[in-house]
A protein has these predicted regions:
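Cytochrome P450 catalytic-core helices
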Residues: 254-260, 266-289, 375-395
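Conserved cytochrome P450 K-helix E-x-x-R motif and the immediately C-terminal K′/meander segment
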Residues: 24, 291-327
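Cytochrome P450 proximal C-terminal region
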Residues: 27, 381-430
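Conserved cytochrome P450 catalytic core segment spanning the I/J/K helices
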Residues: 128, 134, 210-270
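Active-site substrate-recognition loop segments, prototypically the cytochrome P450 B′-helix/B-C loop
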Residues: 1-159, 171-186, 190-203, 207-211
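Conserved cytochrome P450 K-helix/beta-meander segment immediately N-terminal to the heme-binding cysteine loop
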Residues: 340-362
Length: 430
C-alpha cells in the first residue's frame, strides 16, 4: 500500500531518515496535489511549496505572524509539559521561571512589526557591509589554519573539522568572547536547536535546552554590563548600546538577539558549508570548472543555497481570516513555508532539480524575503565563499570510501552531520 501524502508528512515530522536526507519527491508530490495549497492534518498546517504563495505570505506580516516560526502551538505543548515537570527539580526551578518569561517575549525571528522593525533598526549596524568587508581577510586566515590541521593527512571530516569550526570561530570573534570557550558556546548553540524541528523532544532534551539558555543568559548578562560601561568594536557592544530614537533595547531583547546571533551565526552556515563540500566532492566536472575560474564561486554559492539550503521550512500563523490562492484560511491556522520546496518550484526556474551555476536571476528564498530577510546573510555568504575556495584547493577531492551520509535530526533545518573526504595530501599551504 502506498502511503498517503499526510502519512509521508508525518514520517517527516517523526524525522524519518530517508525523508530527512531527500524530501524532494515528497515536496513535488505535495505541489502536484495542491490546488494551490495542501492542508496537512499531521502537521496541523498548510504546507506551502509554491514560490509564489510563499512570497505572498512573506510580504504580508500583518496577515501572517512570525510569532512561532519553528513549531505550531500543538508541537510546542510537549516542551511546555516537560518544563512544568522540570520546574519541580529544585536546581532547575529558577531556570524554568526565566524560560517562561522569555517565552512571552518576541525578539527578531519571533517578532512582528512594529517591534521587529524597531529591533532591526537597532541591530542592523551590527552586520553593516563595511564590517563584513573588513572581516574577509580574517575569515580567510581562520579558514587556512583549519585546513592546515588536516591537509597533510589527505583525509578529513569536512563537517566536524571545518564546517562546524569556521562559523563558530568567526561568530565568537565578532561577539568578542574568548575562543578557548568555543566548546561551551557550541554546546549552548546545539541545545538551542533542540526544539527546532523536533516535534516531540524528550524531557532530558528540554532540560538541556532550558539549562543552556539559563547559563547563556548568566554569562552574557555580565558581558553586556561590561560593554555598556566600556564599549568595544564587537557585536556584544553593538547590542548592549543599541538604541532607536533614543530608546535602548530591553534586557530580554538584548539576550534574545545574542542567542539568535550565536545559533544562526553557526548552525545554518555549518549546514551550508557541508552541502557545498558534498557537491564539490561528488561533481568533478563542476569542481574543475570552478577551480579554473574562481570568479564563478559566488554564483556557485547562490545555486547551493537554492538547490540545498540549510532551512527546510518555517511556520507562520494567520492573524485574521484570509486565503491562499483561493483556499480559505481561518484566523489562527498555521502555514509551513517549505523554503526548500519553493526553491525547486518549476515556476521559479526550469529543471529545478538540476544544479546549474548559470541560473540568472537566481531568486531563491534560502535567506527568506521581506520583513524577516536574514540579518546575517552577508556573513553567511562571505564564509561560504571562503569555504568553497578552501575546498577547491584540496587536490582531487572525493568522498571517502567509508563515508555514509547522516543528516541533522530536524525537519526544520537540513544539513549533514559528517562529510568524510579524501584528497591528495598537502604538505605546505600558500
Amino acid at each position: 500500500m502506498t502511503d498517503s501524502l499526510d502519512d509521508r508528512i508525518r514520517r517527516l515530522l517523526d524525522r524519518d531518515e530517508e525523508l530527512l536526507a531527500s524530501p524532494w519527491q515528497l515536496f513535488d508530490d505535495v505541489r502536484e496535489a495542491s490546488a494551490p495549497a495542501f492542508y496537512s492534518e499531521a502537521m496541523g498546517a498548510w504546507v506551502i511549496t509554491s514560490h509564489r504563495l510563499l512570497h505572498q505570505i512573506l510580504v504580508d506580516p500583518a496577515t501572517w505572524s512570525n510569532c512561532s516560526p519553528t513549531a505550531t502551538y500543538e508541537f510546542r505543548n510537549p516542551v511546555a509539559e516537560h518544563a512544568h515537570a522540570i520546574e519541580k527539580e529544585s536546581e532547575m526551578a529558577e531556570a524554568v521561571r526565566r524560560f517562561r518569561n522569555r517565552s512571552r517575549g518576541r525578539v527578531l525571528n519571533t517578532a512582528d512589526p512594529p517591534e521587529h522593525v524597531r529591533q532591526r533598526r537597532a541591530l542592523n549596524r551590527a552586520f553593516r557591509p563595511d564590517r563584513l568587508r573588513a572581516l574577509q581577510p580574517e575569515v580567510a586566515s581562520v579558514s587556512e589554519s583549519l585546513v592546515a590541521a588536516f591537509a597533510p593527512r589527505g583525509r578529513a571530516d569536512l563537517v566536524q573539522e571545518y564546517a562546524v569550526l569556521l562559523p563558530m570561530v568567526m561568530i565568537s570573534r565578532m561577539l568578542g568572547v574568548p575562543e578557548d570557550e568555543l566548546a561551551v558556546f557550541k554546546g549552548w548553540s546545539d541545545d538551542f536547536a533542540i526544539p527546532i524541528g523536533r516535534a516531540r523532544p524528550s524531557r532530558d532534551e528540554v532540560r538541556s535546552y532550558i539549562k543552556s539558555e539559563y547559563e547563556f543568559d548568566e554569562y552574557f548578562s555580565v558581558l553586556v554590563e561590561q560593554r555598556q560601561a566600556e564599549p568595544r568594536d564587537d557585536l556584544i557592544s553593538d547590542v548592549a548600546n543599541a538604541e532607536v530614537d533614543g530608546e535602548p533595547l530591553t534586557h530580554e531583547e538584548r539576550m534574545g538577539a545574542l542567542r539568535q546571533f550565536l545559533l544562526a551565526g553557526n548552525e545554518t552556515t555549518t549546514t551550508l558549508l557541508g552541502n557545498i563540500g558534498h557537491r564539490l566532492a561528488t561533481d568533478r566536472g563542476l569542481r574543475d570548472r570552478l577551480a579554473a575560474d574562481r570568479d564563478l564561486v559566488p554564483a556557485f554559492v547562490e545555486e547551493a543555497l537554492r538547490h540545498e539550503g540549510p532551512v527546510t521550512g518555517l511556520f507562520r500563523v494567520a492573524t485574521r481570516d484570509t486565503d491562499l490562492g483561493g483556499e480559505p484560511v481561518a484566523e489562527g491556522e498555521f502555514a509551513w513555508l517549505a523554503f526548500a520546496a519553493a526553491n525547486r518550484d518549476p515556476e521559479l526556474c526550469p529543471v529545478p532539480h538540476e544544479f546549474d551555476i548559470a541560473r540568472h536571476p537566481n531568486d531563491h528564498v534560502a535567506f527568506g524575503y521581506g520583513e524577516h530577510y536574514c540579518i546575517g546573510q552577508g556573513l553567511a555568504r562571505l564564509e561560504a565563499t571562503v569555504g568553497a575556495n578552501a575546498m577547491l584547493d584540496l587536490p582531487n577531492l572525493v568522498l571517502a570510501r567509508d563515508h555514509r551520509d547522516a543528516f541533522m535530526d530536524s525537519y526544520i533545518l537540513r544539513g549533514r552531520t559528517r562529510l568524510l573526504v579524501g584528497f591528495d595530501p598537502i604538505t605546505a599551504l600558500g
